[in-house]
């Protein structure tokens, strides 16, 4: 399914030069999707941190209570206080990126983490741990 105007609650996408983008998103109505395998590789000169149209594969649904847990975790984690770009240990020539987008209570935040790995930002680690627990992301 191609990206549409659905309301995204939380989404993360990992983009690397030599791999198709991978990621998950949960829509405001509780449906969750993962990136489809037929997405194209980034071009050799394309900035990895730009938003791109992706195909998504429906995967399941979470409950209203689980949506509330995600919203609370996003608010309480400090995610909305992060800088828009996290250049942590930035020493690679063309590092991959993780692009996180969260929409809660009318507030939207997009954070790009360069060379994404666990323990780059505690705020993001909390959200990632919750997504792993809820949907296996």
Predicted feature residues:
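Structural signal for glycine-centered tight turns and loop->strand junctions in beta-sheet-rich domains
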Residues: 28-32
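Short, well-ordered, aromatic-rich surface patches in folded extracellular/luminal domains
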Residues: 1-18, 22, 65, 72-73, ...
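A short-motif feature that recognizes glycine-rich, charge-decorated loops
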Residues: 35-82
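Short, surface-exposed binding/anchoring microloops in extracellular/periplasmic proteins
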Residues: 22-24, 36
């Amino acid at each position: 399914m191609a990206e549409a105007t659905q309301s995204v609650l939380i989404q993360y996408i990992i983009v690397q030069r030599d791999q198709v983008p991978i990621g998950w998103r949960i829509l405001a109505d509780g449906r969750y999707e993962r990136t489809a395998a037929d997405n194209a590789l980034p071009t050799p000169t394309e900035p990895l941190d730009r938003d791109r149209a992706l195909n998504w594969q429906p995967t399941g649904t979470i409950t209203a209570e689980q949506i509330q847990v995600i919203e609370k975790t996003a608010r309480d984690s400090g995610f909305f206080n992060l800088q828009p770009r996290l250049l942590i240990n930035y020493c690679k020539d063309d590092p991959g990126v993780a692009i996180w987008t969260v929409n809660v209570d009318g507030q939207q935040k997009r954070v790009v983490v360069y060379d994404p790995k666990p323990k780059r930002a505690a705020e993001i680690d909390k959200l990632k741990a919750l997504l792993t627990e809820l949907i296996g992301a």
